[in-house]
Amino acid sequence: ALGELPVKRAIIDGGITPYQLPYLIRKLLLARDMLSFKLAVNNRKILEAAFPPERFTLPGHDPKKEYDAIEAYLKTYSDQTIRNIFWSGNNYVLPKTPAKIGTKITYWYGDEEKKDRRSNIRFIKHYFPQARIHGIPKMAHAELVMIYPEEFCRYFDKFMCR
């Protein structure tokens, strides 16, 4: 955003932009996010409802084993780590206006997360008016890169190598 590093092309993949809300509201959202995370970690049904195993398990992998491993790993997060993840993801500072740059920017999001990305898309359009907004059909957040890495690479190559 400062223009200190020359960048010809940039992909913002489902990027979370800073909240444009009062501090107290941001703290309440942090509490909601932490509670949601802890509920998913401590209740397998909630975790699987949020990320259905049949959709988020790589082909050839056992969904039960995968989700057992995810569940065990997520339980290692301390409350402070969870707090830091959510707070830093939503509450960082950018310059009031970005540097005047010639960077080609695209913002990717999964079509199935469009409602969740509405404020992020609005922010990107305002902050980087030259950005191209691109919805990825039939995808949820992070699904393209996690489950379809070859397709992710095709999108990447198409944007970076044109």
For each predicted feature, which ranges?
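Catalytic histidine-centered segment of alpha/beta-hydrolase-like enzymes
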Residues: 136-153
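C-terminal alpha-helix
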Residues: 154-162
